[in-house]
Amino acid sequence: MTIAIKMGFLDGDPIVDDQGRLVGRGGGTALVERLLKMYPGAVVVDHEDRQFDGFEAKTLSSLDPLETLVINLDVIDSVGVFQTMHREGAEPKLLNLQWLPPSHYHHKVNFAAMVLAYALFPTLCSGERTAGEVTELVRRWTISPLAHQARIAWVQPGIRDDLVREHVDPEVPTVLYPAIHLTDNKQPKVFLDVMHRVASEKDVRMEVRLSQRDLASVMAMKMSSPKWASVGPLFGQREEYWEALARMTAFLATAKNEAYGFEYLEALVAGAVGVFPDAAWARKTVPEDYPYFYRTTDEAVSML
């Protein structure tokens, strides 16, 4: 049985770069790397068949439906994956890997597409909270016969710590924006407003690493304008990423909700101090006695 891992088909950006490395997509890329390590010989679904150093890429049409399990991180198009592989009548095997909270999407068509995928194919969620969202969507958005056949489970993925570097305190305290996107859920404006207030009182630097699409946004331009800000693209290699994390003093989390807080866990392991909103998702991310939770932006400024 071949394991085929599919991710990144929804935004049109490349999945693998010219050097044969997976393009950084935060938690999604890390999950793909984990799966490739867990299942030697697994392939990555791409737009063309290619051989890379350490793994192989194949198109959906070149996979044998009878001998392949597709683990789909793009759950919203699982039905389309099935239809592509079912053209000759074979019954393909699919597993939804819901690594983002479903609330990442907003349009009713997206919810309907996801719910149909949840009902038709088994779904593994990253964290109990995400599994709860998936279960509730299935209950609300689909008919009873389909809802009853949904198979939903969850796992706490954890993080890799084999690349962790020794923490180094920078000369100027550096605060990390702990995300690669500037979506409304991440509330980058709140982050930037807090940083402006901190920078008016203390000598501080801000570091932001964004996906290619987010780098071209108006919000990214605003974040890069202060002289104490450094805004750039994602690192090409995981080693570079961990070396940079080791030099972070702190990070400020401003998200409304998260699936399992992948970026926050990595930053904490690397030695950065995390300042979190006093929200249920954040409380579940760290130990019970963790001290740095803010209820207002004034408190966030004070803690930083």
Please name every model-derived segment.
Residues 217-238:
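Nucleotide-activated donor-binding/catalytic signature segment of Leloir-type glycosyltransferases, i.e.
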Residues 6, 165-186, 192-199, 207:
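Conserved donor-binding/catalytic core segment of Leloir-type glycosyltransferases
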Residues 101, 129-130, 147-165:
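Short beta-strand->alpha-helix junction loop in the catalytic core
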Residues 204-219, 234:
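Glycosyltransferase donor-sugar binding loop
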